[in-house]
Every structure is written in C-alpha cells, then in structure tokens.
Amino acid sequence: MKRTLLSWSSGKDSAWSLHLLRQQHEYGIVGLLTTFNQAANRVAMHAVRRSLVEAQAKAVGIPLWDVDLPWPCSNADYEGIMKEKCKDAVQSGIECIAFGDLFLTNIRAYREKQLENSGLQPIFPVWGMPTLELARSMIKSGVRAKLTCVDPKLLAPEFVGREFDEQLLSEFPSDIDPCGENGEFHTFVYAGPMFQHDLLVEVGETVSRDGFVFADLSPRHNRVTPCRKRATDAPDR
C-alpha cells in the first residue's frame, strides 16, 4: 500500500475520507496532517483545541503530524512551511496526501499545483460525491459531529454548536450545502466508524471573531466510551 498522509481538519469530511480509504487496499494512512494557529494553539479555521485533535488521533490510532503556523500567516509563509513539511514527508517514505475536498475546483487545483514536483501525489477520496447523500451516509453510519464554526454571512449563528444530524439538515435553508463545502460551517467529529472509541466533549461559550462565530468545545472528562458496533459499520481491513 502507498504510505499516505491525510489532511485532517478535525471535521467530518476528513474523517469520512479516512473511513473510505481504510476500506481500500491501495493507500495506508500513516499520519494525520493538521495545521494549528500557533498563537491560539487551535486548528486554523475550525478553532478546535489541539488537545481535542490529539484525542482524535488516539481514537483513530494514527499519529498526528502537526504543523504550527504563525498568526497572522501570509500565503507565502504558509506555502513555505508546508513545502518543508512535504519534504519531511517524502524523506519519511510518504507517497501521497489525501484531502477531503468535495467539489471546489479552485481548491483542488491549488493543492495539485502546490504538490507539483514535490514527490507527493494528491488524492481526493470523497471528490464529486453528492453532498446531501454524503451527509446522510455519514450520519447513518454513526458519524457524530458538532458545528464548531459558522460564517454568519451564509448561515445563522444560532446553528453553531449544534449536532450534525438529520434534524440539522432539515433546518438548513435551501441554499446551504449540506456538507458546508462553500464555507457555511465547519465541524468537529467525536464519534464514528473510524474511531476506536468515542470522545466526550461539551459545547462551551460562543465567540464572534474575525467575521465568524465559534463554539468552544472542550473535553467533558478523561473517561472514554467504547464504540458500540453499528450494523452499518464496514468490517475492519
């Protein structure tokens, strides 16, 4: 199998990409590549605490490849830091990087351009999947997630902190992508078929910052809850 890093935002699309790739024999996920705002010690954009992402990595049984970004971070700084991380990956025998992008062609083209001549092949496991069908498949399979960030220009701020479930999908306005691919919202996954055990999290205060609304998630306590075997779970391979 090709040794592969998975771009891990802590959200549902990267988690579902992991689930799909584990059912194939072509790619072996050996690391979760996550960028952190160094000043805040949180995932960029999702604003999820580093400790929660570390807990996710333990729950899926894959090492975390963390990348600390300065704040503010220019595009030039970002690209330079990621270029060095890619060099490290190649030297470690990594062959591919997987991304959870769904349909934004400009984002895909940017990733492909940045990886040209890097020695790393970009792959897109969930690319082109109909997003309503995809969202329902995630929920049916047992994926559990909270909305951690909402763009109030696109979606009412009252949705932040909500559970990503069928009820939520039914309440979305018709112009909202069910997976939030246009930047309407971002999520944090705390349970699912890709996890060895569920994470216990609680939703704290809501904060408005930099034009976005965030729900501050924190660990509820240290005890872990074993995942219940779900009828829709694919067998481990």
Predicted regions and their residues:
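Nucleotide-activated chemistry modules centered on ATP-dependent adenylation/adenylyltransferase
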Residues: 1-237
